[in-house]
Amino acid sequence: MKLRRIISLALTLALVLALTGCGSGEKKTTVLRFGLEVAPDTVTCKAAERIAAEVYERTNGSVTIEVYPSGQLGTQRDYIESAMLGIIDIGYTSIAGLESFEPEFILYDIPFTVFSSEHAQALWDSEQSQAVQQKLLEEKGLRTMCWLDMGPRNVYTTQEVRTAADFSKLTMRLADVKGLINLFDALHASPQVLAFSDIYTGMQTGVVNGFEIGLASVLASKLEEVVDYCVETSHTYTIDCFFMSEASFQNKLTEEEREIVLDAFKNGGQWQIDTFQENIPVYKQQLADAGVETIVLPEEEMQKLFTMAEPAIEKSIAGIYDISIVDQIRDMAP
């Protein structure tokens, strides 16, 4: 009986030691939470999924990025604040969304300064841009991982606009953004603040007769159904970005994993840019098929708009940048 007990205890101890050994040898797995407001079928969300897949594969599963689309983790502002507090690890925002936390991000949103994807890339890579991103990292603990191409913002309207003077015909739906309101006020349009969700009804009922957003957003919300013209103003070029909590980047990842994550975001960001640009002809054809005429203003009329916009531009950067920044950004065009 005593022998049996000794054998039983020995076997139990051996089992415990074996299990302990297995536990100590288990591979560390780091889970990073990634919040996006956009739907799963968007190019932006697909880019996030590609990044997650590349990181998982290249780290052999030691780093898993869980992507939460469609606002499951909140709004863009929530992502920024949560990443600063370490509640989530990675987020998505428009560059405009960062201006509330670091005013110098207005650099990317100054009207009539960026006119193409290549131009946006040059701005993102510029010394001025890198300084702003470094300031965000040092003061807010947020690391920008890559920029995302959302294309130019144009004017969509029921009114025929072929000259700078024609902008006075427009009652423009605008987001409650001071810079946009100042801009269209300077262009002699009548600004009207409405929620994005109210654009369709506002156009149908005549509360407004124009609005400004990117083409992909127009089609996603079927707003081509309530307009007759697209006026290619390219008054701003929308740049979004993926960002990461610096605390998560430094404390949750090994040096090798950090390099893999940085590389994956670089690859995923470039894929998003390339894919978005490839889709633009498709988007434009969809707009034309819906019966919307695209108007390209003559160069002299665009120059008039630039001149009219100068007071609004000065207001938007007052106390942040000298007016010389406008020409500096324009001169970055490839």
PLM-predicted stretches and their roles:
Residues 23-119, 128, 137-139, 143-334:
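N-terminal secretory/targeting leader peptides
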Residues 1-31, 334:
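Short, low-complexity disordered leader/linker segments with a strong preference
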